[in-house]
Amino acid sequence: MTNPQGPPNDPSPWARPGDQGPLARPPASSEASTGRLRPGEPAGHIQEPVSPPTQPEQQPQTEHLAASHAHTRRSGRQAAHQAWDPTGLLAAQEEEPAAVKTKRRARRDPLTVFLVLIIVFSLVLAGLIGGELYARHVANSKVAQAVACVVKDQATASFGVAPLLLWQVATRHFTNISVETAGNQIRDAKGMQIKLTIQNVRLKNTPNSRGTIGALDATITWSSEGIKESVQNAIPILGAFVTSSVVTHPADGTVELKGLLNNITAKPIVAGKGLELQIINFNTLGFSLPKETVQSTLNEFTSSLTKNYPLGIHADSVQVTSTGVVSRFSTRDAAIPTGIQNPCFSHI
């Protein structure tokens, strides 16, 4: 049985979308929702879907927001991927400068820290030692210069080992100072040497003093040869004839001055604040020389040598030895004169 031929231009019923047979795909939900049947209309008639009115003014904003959200999501995914990418972390660590790695390792290395502390301690100790040596050099020079100015001879000074001189300079309190002269002379007394021990010095500038000295003890040694030269200088014309040699007698504490024409025996004694050579025996050969004249000359000479020391220094005792005369001087709680009162102390 054959199908009747339709008009040549009539499309085949198999090509119609609306009549696809029982095996055709059912219409989509959107199509079913938009096409509704109305009463009075034929069953094959499907109403065209009515599109909602467009709002052109909101479409650009919606598209912009959608594009912004899409860009944000892509950026977030890329950032998360980069943040959790172990390969990127390894690459960043490999690119870290070697100096920074070495510095971090040095901070964590106990040996390096210990060596740094040792170096710092050594530098501080070296600076302290250098400052101590410099302070001692300056202080020794000033004290020696003052003593040399008083005794008219070269002098050397030294401060005690403890406490540190830097601390003594800071507190202006000096505990122990030792001074020794060269032994050439003290003023005009030839062959005389002095050794000083100075304690408890406190420097404090006042109109009348530079400070105080708690205690000063001096040991003065006068050699036999020095006594001879000193007496010869004290008697300008007859000195060489009066004293050609000096012999000491420790047993009786006398000094014998032998000359070409005389023989004088004198005893060193403490007189006032200094020393004197008191004539015990005086013998002349061939000429007459008054004993009083010789005694007066010796007194003036020894007075100029051993009296009127600064700081109130005075003689305490004297002793005759086999090599000369040893005397001891001292002072307590003495005021240090200013540079105006005594130029020898101007640098203290």
Curated annotation (Swiss-Prot):
A GO CC term attached to the entry: plasma membrane
A Pfam match: LmeA
Residues spanning the membrane = 111-131, 235-255
The annotated region (Disordered) lies at: 1-83
Superkingdom as given in the UniProt entry: Bacteria
- Cell location: Cell membrane
Q: Where is the composition biased (Pro residues)?
A: 1-11
Q: Which UniProt keywords apply?
A: Cell membrane, Membrane, Transmembrane, Transmembrane helix
Q: Per UniProt, what is the membrane topology? A: Multi-pass membrane protein
Remaining remarks: Was identified as a high-confidence drug target.
Query: What's the protein name?
Result: Uncharacterized protein Rv0479c
